[in-house]
Amino acid sequence: MSAQNIQSAGKCPVMHGANTEVGTSNMDWWPKALNLDILHQHDTKTNPMDEEFSYREAVKTLDFAAVKRDVEALMTDSQAWWPADWGHYGGLMIRMAWHAAGSYRAADGRGGANTGNQRFAPLNSWPDNANLDKARRLLWPIKKKYGNRLSWADLIVLAGNVAYESMGLKTFGFGFGREDIWHPEKDTYWGAEKEWLAPSDERYGSVDDPSTMENPLAAVQMGLIYVNPEGVNGKPDPLKTAAQVRETFARMGMNDEETVALTAGGHTVGKTHGNGRAENLGPSPEGADISEQGLGWMNHKTRGIGRDSVTSGIEGAWTTHPTKWDNGYFDMLFGHEWELKKSPAGAWQWEPVDIREEDMPVDVEDPSIRCKPIMTDADMAMREDPIYRKISERFHKDPALLTETFARAWFKLIHRDMGPKARYIGPEVPAEDLIWQDPVPAGKTGYDVDAVKAKIAASGLSIAEMVATAWDSARTFRQSDFRGGANGARIRLAPQKDWEGNEPARLQKVLAVLEPIAADSGASVADVIVLAGNVGIEQAAKAAGVNVTVPFAPGRGDATQEMTDADGFAVLEPIHDGYRNWVKKDYVVSAEELMLDRTQLMGLTAAEMTVLVGGMRVLGTNHGGAKHGVFTDKVGTLSQDFFVNLTDMNNVWKPAGAHYEIRDRKTDAVKWTATRVDLVFGSNSILRAYAEVYAQDDNQEKFVRDFVNAWTKVMNADRFDLK
């Protein structure tokens, strides 16, 4: 806003108003610049809670039974401003919980329900989430009542779980413990499209081959949770849709049986809404008028609620009794022939060719009126795809099997992004350990830590071997879904022991030394691996003239191969590691951007990333012993040399093929080689500011101290028992 515009707008008395508008940002001017913002989100400045507040402690004081009673009572307390279908909000609440959890994708662990992110853009305004703003607003009195003891993230999912129970399903259990965020997530890549529901072609190598969908995406179009219910790119074809369903659910970590159960169970209750014209709907919540107070898709042209509401555009229920858990979905699917029709909103849907009136569901407002049921193209895929059909027929013949399979799959869906069972809170946490929870047995704490460290120090392992092995064990941790990490020592099991990024030959050499030490000492291998890294760092710090004890908390357990889902762990395989200066192959995304993504998943800040990279380089931990970025002649000493030499203007940096040479500015002699990951710490203005701190003459001890703190954070990232 220019001064002239301010005057013409009524002499705005402050100039800072322009800064609240969408102006030209640094990323607009320099779109290829490294965007470090993803490392600095969800900090204390955006969190309104007191500094000492712990949601995980607060939720333990909740009257869980009372909350469930209130949520169940809400199901049949229809409100005139958004009336419940058939007097029961169950279908709406299930869809809300489903779409919150269903945004999860296994490739990077992002999405999902564990942060309450459905409250914020873009998810709150996705076309597929239309009218879920009403569901959350219906829940507000309960959230208001229980306050800080009940997060939105927990409440959203709990509402779906209780909805199923209120309609007759015996659920598998429920765990509280999801913590709210307070602004939109900046790290999640939802796709490159610039318009909602753009054709699928933009995110596939070939739409005919769903496996070519761009990673880490799982939904077929921008703004959808799963697949297009009308068919691939809105064109009905159940077999083509089946292929997309299979790929999409696989990318969420679901197999074919779970996929069929979830599809059937999700469509046993509730209905779709398309009895009207979509063009009568107002903007989504983010684009709505201020007077709408955060609600979107408001219809001010027609009645727009109840039987006249429009959401997906498809219109109708799937079963005869949409507020009751039963086997009606498969009775309907296999009990009729189906034909393509258009809904009142113009959406493709399948309707029965012939059906008895008593088999039709009643109208949502008038039980004397019967309405034709519908199936989406995804539902027809359960019938037409040979593999899905076989599973569907088995469920049709055995309703108890469907109930059991669905209850477990639903539990998996709504807890998949919560990490190990140790993070679940509440009286309904199932006792059974499930393999997708990455179970780890309890560790031991009663051994002599100093004696173990002494054995490690005398083992003959090098500093680089000890530090690199501990790092590789811990670096798999993802704060997105709390998977991975050093606890369990799965680095010694398939598939991790064979990952190229873990240097299998070097790994086996180190394990052959550390495993006997663990056995002799009564410690877990997981603990000994981390301790070995700590020993290496302490030795390297001492060589730099700094005496330091790296913090250590015993108690990690050792997982077994039987506890490990090898296929499920495949998504955690590192294909790059900027901290060890390695990429598996050339990628479209730059190495420094890959490092940034890994850093965010590990929960590190830009400053922590900087100090760790500088320290790892001088410790000689590069993958394969590569010399790139090792700007020191004292490898194995935890010195500032990486930063000192990177920022030294007596040096000049020149491209040399895929890498760079650091040459003496006067003699042109090659002193070191480097990668883009190394040089970005001198090139990016923010990272250079951090690098200069660690290059200063007065910061040797600070460098060591900060490195140790960041290292300990990585080693303990999955120690949920300590938090």
From Swiss-Prot:
Its EC number is 1.11.1.21. Binds 1 heme b (iron(II)-protoporphyrin IX) group per dimer. GO terms for biological process: cellular response to hydrogen peroxide; hydrogen peroxide catabolic process. InterPro entries: Catalase_peroxidase, Haem_peroxidase, Haem_peroxidase_sf, Peroxidases_AS. Its cofactor is heme b. There is a cross-link at residues 226-252 (Tryptophyl-tyrosyl-methioninium (Tyr-Met) (with W-98)). It catalyses: H2O2 + AH2 = A + 2 H2O; 2 H2O2 = O2 + 2 H2O. It is an enzyme of class 1 (oxidoreductase). One of its GO terms (cellular component) is cytosol. It holds the Pfam family peroxidase. The record marks 95 as: Transition state stabilizer. Gene3D superfamilies: 1.10.520.10, Peroxidase, domain 2. Keywords: Heme, Hydrogen peroxide, Iron, Metal-binding, Oxidoreductase, Peroxidase. Residues 267-286 are annotated as: Disordered. The active site is at 99 (proton acceptor). Formation of the three residue Trp-Tyr-Met cross-link is important for the catalase, but not the peroxidase activity of the enzyme. One of its GO terms (molecular function) is heme binding. There is a cross-link at residues 98-226 (Tryptophyl-tyrosyl-methioninium (Trp-Tyr) (with M-252)). Heme b binds at residue 267. The keyword Oxidoreductase applies. Disulfide bonds: none annotated. It comes from the Bacteria. Bifunctional enzyme with both catalase and broad-spectrum peroxidase activity. Belongs to the peroxidase family. Peroxidase/catalase subfamily. Homodimer or homotetramer. This is Catalase-peroxidase.
